[in-house]
């Protein structure tokens, strides 16, 4: 998809380029695939295992369908499983945690009960879709695993703000923001600038969001070390300079 998107740029005045309508559709399709990347579940299992006896945990899921590796589709079918269902099954059945979905499928009364049980610690975790974007207040959240991310600064700053809301006994919140890369940093480090140029916007947007989260974090140094490794491996600084010198500025495109 990234290669196809790279072929959909059209010229504008002043040497600028923008995506065609077809390119924008492909970019949205790629965004959904990023949101539902299969290996996010594997990483979630590793990261959440130390928290299986904790409570007040939010897993923020994508609305996209889970796709097996190699599949290039985003339409629903009977063979697809929503990411949130995979999460609930893994935490509830595999890890023995008490967890419930928190989505638009639950009515206002059900949501109210879930929020109450969650706040009391009777329900360890909530797996949610879009709740941080819909004005839902759950200030008792202490740990959040963000499987679904956005490249819109306004949205991810708003989501962070909702997670950091004050609650009795809550001094801070732990936020795990899952960064999705097209391939590993080791692979990227061994490639040329031309090889990684096609994924510049995708990776740069992920790093930019990570840096925004990191700059106010207590573990700023550790977080920025990880992001700097990504930046260096994918040659983001060199690519940014090349794009600027050629009059292109892909990273400012809101659809990327």
What kind of region is each of these model predictions?
Residues 2-117:
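Conserved helicase/translocase motor-coupling segment
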Residues 8, 13-15, 192, 212, ...:
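Compositionally biased, intrinsically disordered low-complexity regions
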Residues 222-233:
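A conserved mid-domain beta-alpha-beta active-site/ligand-binding segment of alpha/beta enzyme cores
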Residues 92-221:
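Conserved RecA-like P-loop NTPase helicase motor core
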Residues 44, 51, 55, 214-224:
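Short secondary-structure junctions and interdomain/linker hinges
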Residues 237-256:
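The feature captures the C-terminal accessory region of ATP-dependent helicases
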Residues 77-80, 84, 196, 203-206, ...:
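Intrinsic-disorder-associated interaction segments
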């Amino acid at each position: 998809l990234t290669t196809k998107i790279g072929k959909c740029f059209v010229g504008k005045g002043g040497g600028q380029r923008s995506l065609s309508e077809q390119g924008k559709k492909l970019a949205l399709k790629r965004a959904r695939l990023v949101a539902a990347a299969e290996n996010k579940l594997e990483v979630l299992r590793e990261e959440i295992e130390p928290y299986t006896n904790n409570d007040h945990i939010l897993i923020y899921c994508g609305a996209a369908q889970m796709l097996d590796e190699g599949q290039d589709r985003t339409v629903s079918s009977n063979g697809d499983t929503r990411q949130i269902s995979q999460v609930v099954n893994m935490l509830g059945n595999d890890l023995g945690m008490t967890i419930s979905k928190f989505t638009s499928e639950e009515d206002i009364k059900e949501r109210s009960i879930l929020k109450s049980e969650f706040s009391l610690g009777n329900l360890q975790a909530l797996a949610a879709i879009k709740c941080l974007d819909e004005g839902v207040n759950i200030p008792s959240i202490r740990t959040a695993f963000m499987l679904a991310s956005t490249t819109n600064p306004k949205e991810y700053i708003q989501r962070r703000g909702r997670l950091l809301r004050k609650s009795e006994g809550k001094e801070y919140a732990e936020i795990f923001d899952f960064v999705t890369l097209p391939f590993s940093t080791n692979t990227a480090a061994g490639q040329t600038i031309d090889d990684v140029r096609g994924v510049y916007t995708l990776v740069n947007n992920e790093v930019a969001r990570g840096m925004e989260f990191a700059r106010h974090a207590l573990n700023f140094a550790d977080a920025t070390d990880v992001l700097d490794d990504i930046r260096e491996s994918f040659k983001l600084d060199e690519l940014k300079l090349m794009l600027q010198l050629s009059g292109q500025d892909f990273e400012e495109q809101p659809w990327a």
